[in-house]
């Protein structure tokens, strides 16, 4: 079996792992939730949830991954001293494979819209923009092609390995993503009436805070950091023994949150400048925002044209940094467990994800019969991973590390064998034994409508 390699620099660790967390959800979900749930009040609650749930969950996967120094399934075997917990790694790999399949569909739409923006296809009135999306997404050919193209883009990064593929790509994609985001934020905040959008996003309104807002903040903290997918565990297996896990996790959380807030500053000022109250999800980025950009920059068509291109380029980059990490989970499992080359393992992962992606794409209108329990196949995949596999994986990870793995082993990883101060270790252990699992259980109940 070939040498698995590791990250070559601290910057590579931070940018690659932050890239796995930064994705389309930062753009189409966090800003909307912040604006609707009290602005800065929601952000403060979100930070608390990150401390209670996000950081302990991330550190748990980091510890398992770095100590195991292998794919997720084998990492759990190493810490458990046998195969009893190996299913956790396999469950994470399956979860990420399913997510990559349907995520690539939406990422493929972003590629199409980037191309359409370049050739000027998405400029028109509101009805035209809406019909364009409905017609395109239900087409049996084009979305499938773009889905496969996006998965292949991901494949050709992952197949090059950790340093030459994942790390090198992250060092290019993440700074470029940040620059594009800043450019659009400046343009958006410069529009007449943009101040109302900034106020809507950032002005604290504690009157909106209730138990549902608390649960929404918990859920956002959980899903934003890719917990429960074995992604963080897999990336941590490429960390060096000198990597400060606590510091790295804190930096990644800050980057993820800053980008999400900047995404809000990109969306709301432009939307409020033309009197639009944005929604969330795919309709936000494929219907609402094209209309907003068309109307907001109507007096400056050249600027509007450039902003549209930059926006969809931004979405493609955000999606790609996430899909790279998802692909790597399965690739590592395949080539290490089957004792084959990385190239062969990557192709197995790519083919499986392409099959899932094709079914998800066709279920969006071209073949409506592709459904389960009254929901299209893409939605079923989304619900199965978000409502079951991810919360279950993260919950069991906390129990595994908090109660099953020897305390000294966890302490040694937390402190880099006592070369770092371990004052926060008792707090971390208490969190993953009691607080974080309780938070995940609340998310699980909320997902199923019990709370």
What label would you give each PLM region?
Residues 376-400, 421-451:
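A generic transmembrane alpha-helix motif of multi-pass inner-membrane proteins
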